[in-house]
Curated annotation (Swiss-Prot):
Subcellular location, record wording: Cytoplasm
Identification of the protein by name: Ribosomal RNA small subunit methyltransferase J
Alphabetical UniProt keywords: Cytoplasm, Methyltransferase, rRNA processing, S-adenosyl-L-methionine, Transferase
Gene coding for it: rsmJ
HAMAP family assigned: 16SrRNA_methyltr_J
Major localization class: cytoplasm
UniProt similarity note: Belongs to the methyltransferase superfamily. RsmJ family.
Keyword Iron: no
Superkingdom of origin organism: Bacteria
Binding site for S-adenosyl-L-methionine: R111, D112, E127, R128, D179
Length: 258
């Protein structure tokens, strides 16, 4: 897993963008370089119009990957109640439990976390990659500018998810959501550009099975694992039930705590 990439100052960067870029570099330990020092290959971070994005120097025609919780698509889905129809909402068991605290231990770009927040949950995201964590944090920052009530329900912890869950000290966790990165076929048209980039950057999760035991111990009600329909169950552990969608399966593990 790649832990650091350069932060590139855009050629026509504004003072606000440069200030934000330096702040991110100081917090996460990313080296800040000028536009003339932009790498010819590999990944780098940049800020354009106040948005942090991850770019691949070898893919000049591909737009940087960013976390945008306030995108038109996300907000349309929230405003029209689409989130309540999502399989993840059914799997988490939110009917009548909209105020639950959910830990998303594999947040990726945070799309599933935002679905849960949009239906009333409080979500804690745990991310081990400082690069992805920086993108998520920037997404929360920008969401707070327009929708502070939603941003207030999202928090981020940087660290190894299995370890953070094992020693979790926050408020009670009602449910935990796991969506380990699964190796896709190279020619699969279903893998979107950002997921291809993430897989190149982070690889699949070799320790995915290690996430289930601490999750089952921490959650008070259930653990939900998202898997491709063709994938085996996580850690060889048979779920209590499964909810299937067209492309994925949500394995649900009910937790019975004394």
């Amino acid at each position: 897993m790649l832990n650091s990439v350069p932060l590139v100052i855009a050629q026509h960067s504004t003072q606000d963008d440069t200030s934000l870029l330096n702040s991110i570099g100081n917090k996460w330990g990313f080296p800040v370089v000028s536009h003339s020092e932009k790498p010819a290959e590999g990944f780098y971070l940049q800020i354009q119009n106040g948005v942090l994005g991850l770019a691949d120097a070898s893919e000049k025609k591909v737009l940087p990957v960013e976390v945008d919780f306030a995108s038109p698509a996300s907000l349309y889905r929230k405003q029209h109640g689409g989130g309540r129809k999502e399989p993840i909402v059914k799997a988490i068991g939110l009917k009548g439990n909209e105020g639950w605290h959910v830990v998303d231990a594999t947040p990726g770009l945070g799309r599933d976390a935002f679905v849960l927040v949009s239906v009333g949950c409080k979500v804690t995201m745990i991310e081990r990659s400082p690069i992805v964590a920086a993108l998520l944090e920037d997404g929360i920052r920008r969401l707070a500018l327009s929708f502070p009530e939603l941003a207030a329900k999202m928090s981020l912890q940087h660290g190894n998810s299995a370890e953070v869950m094992q020693y979790f000290t926050g408020e009670n966790v009602n449910a935990i959501y796991l969506d380990p990165m699964f190796p896709h076929k190279k020619k699969s048209a279903l893998v979107k550009k950002e997921m291809r980039l993430f897989q190149q950057l982070l690889g699949h999760d070799p320790d995915a099975d290690a996430l289930l035991p601490p999750a089952l111990k921490l959650a008070t009600h259930r653990v939900v694992v998202k898997r491709p329909n063709s994938a085996d169950v996580l850690a060889g552990e048979k779920p209590s039930m499964a909810i299937e969608s067209k492309k994925h399966r949500f394995d649900v593990y009910l937790c019975q705590k004394p």
